[in-house]
Amino acid sequence: MLFRSLVCLPNGAPKCEVCPLAAQCKGRAAGRAEQLPVKTAKPEKTLVPVTAALITGPQGVLLQRRPSKGLLAGLWQPLAFEGTAMTQPELDAALRAIGLCVQWQAPLQSTRHVFTHRIWQISGFCGTAAGPAPEGCVWASRAELNGEYAVPSAFAGIMRQWRPE
């Protein structure tokens, strides 16, 4: 345990009288003990646009697995493109490039998820598709979502918009 967390209090009077290092303390010698420790300012959170595609079909909802390293590593999510706010035609072109032909229905209601260092502003579109899932994706039923596929809470607002037929 760090004794300084109990002695050098950032928002209170320091307890120099019980500190075993008081004789060597440069802050106390300079008369600055009440101003220490100096708290560093938290960095600004970066706003990151994310475009999601909530694609449903006869087998359920289409999910893709996130990369094995990084934010939300290995979890499942609806198809999503981090770092870009895409229009429906741009999203359609990106999905056609991976072999997915989508019948678009409506825009998704935007959601926001706050992480410690970034804020995801998630928007997108919902639609239907059929056929095999593209590489790296699976079709998941609602029952499978409750047990087999872990979807991060960042996408909870998007997933709530899934209305299975």
Label each residue range with its predicted role:
Residues 3-165:
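Intrinsically disordered, low-complexity, charged terminal extensions of DNA damage-control enzymes
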